[in-house]
Regions:
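Compositionally biased, low-structure terminal segments
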Residues: 6-7, 76, 90, 132, ...
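Short, hydrophobic/aromatic-rich segments at coil-to-beta transitions
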Residues: 13-16, 122-128
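Alpha-helical protein-protein interaction elements
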Residues: 81-83, 88, 123, 138, ...
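Edge beta-strand at a domain terminus
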Residues: 44, 112-116, 126-159
Length: 159
C-alpha cells in the first residue's frame, strides 16, 4: 500500500488485508454484496514485497491518541495493527469488522485491541486472529483462523 501515514522516512509500510465471505465483492473501491468482511490495516518493514505474502509473526493492535484519534508516531512500526478510527462510517479507517447487505454496512465492530498471528509455510499462510472491539463495558471478540495454500491476492489500491 505505501506511506499513507506520511512518515516520510521509509520506516514502515502500511498494508490493508480484507478477509471476506464469498458473497462479498472486493474489486471496487469499497466492498460490495452481502456477507461479512474483516479489514485489517497493519504495518510491515518498508522493504517488504507484499506480492511475496505477509511476513510471519505476531501483529498487535495499537492504541490511538485519546484527543487527536491519531496513532502516536512511536506505535507506527512493523508488527503493529492500526486500531479502528472512531466514528467514521462512510469509509472506516484502521481495522474494522463489518456485516454488509447490498454493499451497505449493517453491523460493525471497531477493533480496539488484540492480535493477528501469521504463520508461513512457503506460499501457505495461516492467520490466527483474536481482536476485541471498542466496547469497554461489554467487549466482544472477533476471532477467526484463515488458511490459504496459494499466495494472498494483492491489490494496487483499495481494497
Amino acid at each position: 500500500k505505501g506511506d499513507s501515514y506520511y512518515l516520510q522516512d521509509e520506516s514502515c509500510r502500511v498494508v490493508e488485508l480484507y478477509l471476506a465471505e464469498d458473497g462479498v465483492g472486493l474489486t471496487d473501491t469499497w466492498p460490495t454484496g452481502d456477507g461479512r468482511v474483516l479489514k485489517v490495516e497493519f504495518f510491515v518493514e518498508w522493504a517488504t514485497d507484499v506480492t511475496q505474502g505477509i511476513p510471519a509473526g505476531t501483529y498487535k493492535v495499537v492504541a490511538r491518541d485519546e484527543e487527536s484519534k491519531g496513532i502516536p508516531r512511536e506505535f507506527l512500526k512493523p508488527g503493529g495493527i492500526a486500531s479502528g478510527y472512531p466514528n467514521v462510517f462512510t469509509y472506516p479507517q484502521g481495522t474494522w469488522y463489518e456485516k454488509i447487505s447490498n454493499g451497505t454496512m449493517k453491523e460493525y465492530a471497531r477493533i480496539d485491541g488484540g492480535t493477528m498471528t501469521v504463520a508461513r509455510d512457503g506460499d501457505k499462510h495461516t492467520l490466527t486472529i483474536d481482536f476485541i472491539d471498542c466496547d469497554k463495558a461489554h467487549p466482544h471478540h472477533v476471532r477467526t483462523t484463515y488458511s490459504q495454500d496459494t499466495p494472498i491476492n494483492v491489490f494496487g489500491s483499495h481494497p
